[in-house]
C-alpha cells in the first residue's frame, strides 16, 4: 500500500482544539516534524482537516 509523508509546516497554536488534537493524533509535535503513514481514507480525512497546517508528499 502507498504511504504519505506528512510535515507540520505551521503552528497549531491558536487553532481550534479539534485541529490541535488531530495534529497530536498524527504524531506531529514540533514545527517541521514529519511522519510517514499509510495512505488510506482515515489518514486522508485527518490531513484534510488540517491541510492549512501541513504539507503532504507521496513516499514510494
From Swiss-Prot:
InterPro entries xrefs: Ribo_uL30_ferredoxin-like_sf (IPR036919), Ribosomal_uL30_bac-type (IPR005996), Ribosomal_uL30_CS (IPR018038), Ribosomal_uL30_ferredoxin-like (IPR016082)
Cellular component terms per the entry's GO annotation: cytosolic large ribosomal subunit
Gene designation per UniProt: rpmD
Record-level Gene Ontology MF annotations: structural constituent of ribosome
Natural source organism: Streptococcus uberis (strain ATCC BAA-854 / 0140J)
UniProt xrefs under CDD domains: Ribosomal_L30
Name of protein: Large ribosomal subunit protein uL30
Keyword Ribonucleoprotein belongs to the record: yes
NCBIfam families from the UniProt entry: rpmD_bact
Keywords assigned by UniProt, alphabetized: Ribonucleoprotein, Ribosomal protein
Amino acid at each position: 500500500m502507498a504511504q504519505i509523508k506528512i510535515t507540520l509546516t505551521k503552528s497549531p497554536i491558536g487553532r481550534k482544539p479539534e485541529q490541535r488534537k488531530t495534529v497530536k493524533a498524527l504524531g506531529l509535535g514540533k514545527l517541521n516534524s514529519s511522519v510517514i503513514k499509510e495512505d488510506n481514507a482515515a489518514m486522508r480525512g485527518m490531513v484534510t482537516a488540517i491541510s492549512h497546517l501541513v504539507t503532504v508528499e507521496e513516499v514510494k
